[in-house]
Each structure stands twice: as structure tokens, then as C-alpha cells.
From Swiss-Prot:
Function: Catalyzes the initial step of the lipid cycle reactions in the biosynthesis of the cell wall peptidoglycan: transfers peptidoglycan precursor phospho-MurNAc-pentapeptide from UDP-MurNAc-pentapeptide onto the lipid carrier undecaprenyl phosphate, yielding undecaprenyl-pyrophosphoryl-MurNAc-pentapeptide, known as lipid I.
Protein name per UniProt: Phospho-N-acetylmuramoyl-pentapeptide-transferase
Periplasmic topological domain residue ranges: 1-18, 91-96, 157-173, 221-238, 285-287, 358-360
Family in the record: Belongs to the glycosyltransferase 4 family. MraY subfamily.
Cytoplasmic side of membrane: 46-76, 114-133, 189-199, 252-270, 300-341
Keywords: Cell cycle, Cell division, Cell inner membrane, Cell membrane, Cell shape, Cell wall biogenesis/degradation, Magnesium, Membrane, Metal-binding, Peptidoglycan synthesis, Transferase, Transmembrane, Transmembrane helix
Signal peptide start-end: none
Pathway note: Cell wall biogenesis; peptidoglycan biosynthesis
Membrane topology type: Multi-pass membrane protein
Record NCBIfam families: mraY
BP GO terms, sorted: cell division; cell wall macromolecule biosynthetic process; cell wall organization; peptidoglycan biosynthetic process; regulation of cell shape
Catalysis: reaction(s): UDP-N-acetyl-alpha-D-muramoyl-L-alanyl-gamma-D-glutamyl-meso-2,6-diaminopimeloyl-D-alanyl-D-alanine + di-trans,octa-cis-undecaprenyl phosphate = di-trans,octa-cis-undecaprenyl diphospho-N-acetyl-alpha-D-muramoyl-L-alanyl-D-glutamyl-meso-2,6-diaminopimeloyl-D-alanyl-D-alanine + UMP
Length: 360
């Protein structure tokens, strides 16, 4: 929005030309989202407390979590607000990739909001019925994936980039829709499962979004895309603005979500952020890179799948509790130790993922 305004004002003052620089807009996008989150935080927490929108804690969970009962939840609203405002201010509104991310972000946020509302207001511990949650998540994911396929079939936009191989980029055809669906829905649920400890989900999200900001910049730059042997996508550059907005909003939220948390993001935040990371990976043709950089989310999800599968097939559990972060809690690890070690692992995985862009 401000970019368009600056383009009209540059003829009166050349200084407005700075708005055309992607790096400048990326920095101010991050700062805008950060300041909005920091400003909204105390007000959001006070309002949630007034409404008695407190966290519901499982009775079969770790005893250390019982003290979290009643902590304000649905703080993801401030994350989404900060991201959307920042992106609308600093990204080119004509860019289709930006709108794809916003559709998934807001759509999944609405689904998460309904789920949280049923839990905290109606006191329904199960929240939104699972089949309806997955139905609406699927509708959004398939809708966006199908639109992208129609717009980009037979172009690099529907190729699959395989790490470590320069020239292995098969054209997916209709399988692109199926892959995009699983990546978007899967990542949304993976971040949701990870969001079980104070700050555990938000920092890996920040790391992955920061990594994708670099990838988006390279993918939208013809010279760097050619140098790294990745598809050049002319709309990809504006995703840098989206990614830095996620980083800024995430850091602002972490200010209040760090141990001991003053507020939780709830499903409204975790589903939305996960869906956003998923669609960004799809748009950049870096689904494999998401698996590497988002390895913490992958392991958390696999731990749940293995736990459920093992119990149904053998009647035995692999972990003391799933997702796996609860396993380490029950082993005696203090919550801050689990959180920080998962952060360190996440940062390492993002760096490894970025390195794969060159190791080909």
C-alpha cells in the first residue's frame, strides 16, 4: 500500500524511491510487525483475562503444566494482526504470492479461532470437531493449490526442487496439487502439535521464516537463482516481506510468551503460522527444504504418529508421552531446558537447510 503511494510521490521528492528497495521494505516490515506485537501484547493479555479466555490444561499431562491453567490464550490474534498489517503496508498489493499466503494465514487463523473459542468459552475440551477442522483446512489448501496450478502449470512454478541435485526438478503436473495440499495442511498441524511449551513453537517458526526470507530473495533474483540452480520465480521476491513480518510478529509475541508465559498463541496462532510456512514453501518450490529447516515440527509430528500407531498395533507406547517434548519433561528435564535445546536444534536445521542450496 505504502509502496504504491511512494511511487506517486517520488516525482515530488526522490527520497521516496527508498520504498522500491526490497531490503528496506523487509527491514521495516519486520520492525512494524514487531512494534505492533509489542504494543498489542499488554492490551491483548488484559482483555483476554477480562474475558476469562484461559488455557485448558489436560489432567493427564505433566504436573508442572497445572500451574498454566487459566493463562490467557488466543494470543495468536495479535500475531496475525501484526503480520497482516505489516504485509499490507510494505508489500506490493498486486503480487499474487502475497495474497496466497494471506488467504491461508487468515483462513487457518479463523479455523483456529473457532477451535479455541469452543475450548475456552464453551468449555469443550475437544474444541472444533476434528473432521470439520480438517475439512475446512483442506478446502483452503486445495483451493489455493488448484489456483496456483492453473496459473503456473508447465512452468517452474510447478516443478519439484530436490536438494543436492542441480538438474533434478521434475514437472509435477496434477501431483502438484496433492503435494501442496499435504504440505500446507501437514505444516499447519505440525506447528499446532509443537505448541505445547512456553515459546517452543514460536521460535522455530521465526527461524524457519527467516530462512525462507533468504530463499525468497534468491528465488526472486534471476542471477542468484541461476547461480544456486533453483527455479527463478518473478513473484517470489515479495515473499521476503511476508517472511520478515512473521519474524517480527513472532519476536514480539515471544516477549510475552517466553517462560513463564503470560499468554499462549492458541490454535488461532499455531494453525495460521504453520499454514503460512507451508504455503511459502510451496510457492518457493522448496517443500524438501521445509522438511529440513522445520525438522523440529517434523519430529514432533512423527512422535505422535509413532505413539498412536504403536499403541494401536502393539498395545505399547514408545514415548512416555507425545508429542516428544512432553517425553523429555516426564524424564525430568526442566521446561526451559527442553525449550532452549529445541531452539538450538531448530537453528542448526535452518542453517543446514540453507547450506543445501549451495551443496549441489
Amino acid at each position: 500500500m505504502l509502496v504504491w503511494l511512494a511511487e506517486h510521490l517520488v516525482k515530488y521528492y526522490s527520497g521516496f524511491n527508498v520504498f522500491s528497495y526490497l531490503t528496506f521494505r523487509a527491514i521495516v516490515s519486520l520492525l512494524t510487525a514487531l512494534f505492533i506485537s509489542l504494543w498489542m501484547g499488554p492490551r491483548m493479555i488484559a482483555h483476554l483475562q477480562k474475558l476469562s479466555f484461559g488455557q485448558v490444561v489436560r489432567n493427564d499431562g505433566p504436573e508442572s503444566h497445572f500451574s498454566k491453567r487459566g493463562t490467557p490464550t488466543m494470543g495468536g490474534i495479535m500475531i496475525l494482526t501484526a503480520i497482516v498489517i505489516s504485509v499490507l503496508l510494505w508489500a506490493y498489493p498486486s503480487n499474487p504470492y502475497v495474497w496466497c499466503v494471506l488467504v491461508v494465514l487468515v483462513g487457518y487463523g479463523v479455523i483456529g479461532f473457532v477451535d479455541d473459542y469452543r475450548k475456552v468459552v464453551r468449555k469443550d475440551t475437544k474444541g472444533l470437531i476434528a473432521r470439520w477442522k480438517y475439512f475446512w483446512m483442506s478446502v483452503i489448501a486445495l483451493g489455493v493449490a488448484f489456483a496456483l496450478y492453473l496459473a503456473g502449470k508447465d512452468t517452474p512454478a510447478t516443478q519439484l526442487v530436490v536438494p543436492f541435485f542441480k538438474d533434478v526438478m521434475p514437472q509435477l503436473g496434477l501431483f502438484y496439487i496433492l503435494l501442496a495440499y499435504f504440505v500446507i495442511v501437514g505444516t499447519g498441524n505440525a506447528v499446532n502439535l509443537t505448541d505445547g511449551l512456553d515459546g517452543l513453537a514460536i521460535m522455530p517458526t521465526v527461524f524457519v521464516a527467516g530462512g525462507f526470507a533468504l530463499v525468497a530473495w534468491a528465488t526472486g533474483n534471476m542471477n542468484f537463482a541461476s547461480y544456486l540452480h533453483i527455479p527463478y520465480l518473478r513473484h517470489a521476491g515479495e515473499l521476503v516481506i511476508v517472511c520478515t513480518a512473521i519474524v517480527g510478529a513472532g519476536l514480539g509475541f515471544l516477549w510475552f510468551n517466553t517462560y513463564p508465559a503470560q499468554v499462549f498463541m492458541g490454535d488461532v496462532g499455531s494453525l495460521a503460522l504453520g499454514g503460512a510456512l507451508g504455503i511459502i514453501a510451496v510457492l518457493l518450490r522448496q517443500e524438501f527444504l521445509l522438511v529440513i529447516m522445520g525438522g523440529v515440527f517434523v519430529v514432533e509430528t512423527l512422535s505422535v504418529i509413532l505413539q498412536v500407531g504403536s499403541f494401536k498395533l502393539r498395545g505399547q507406547r514408545i514415548f512416555r508421552m507425545a508429542p516428544i517434548h512432553h517425553h523429555y519433561e516426564l524424564k525430568g528435564w526442566p521446561e526451559p531446558r527442553v525449550i532452549v535445546r529445541f531452539w538450538i536444534i531448530s537453528l542448526m536445521l535452518v542453517l543446514i537447510g540453507l547450506a543445501t542450496l549451495k551443496v549441489r
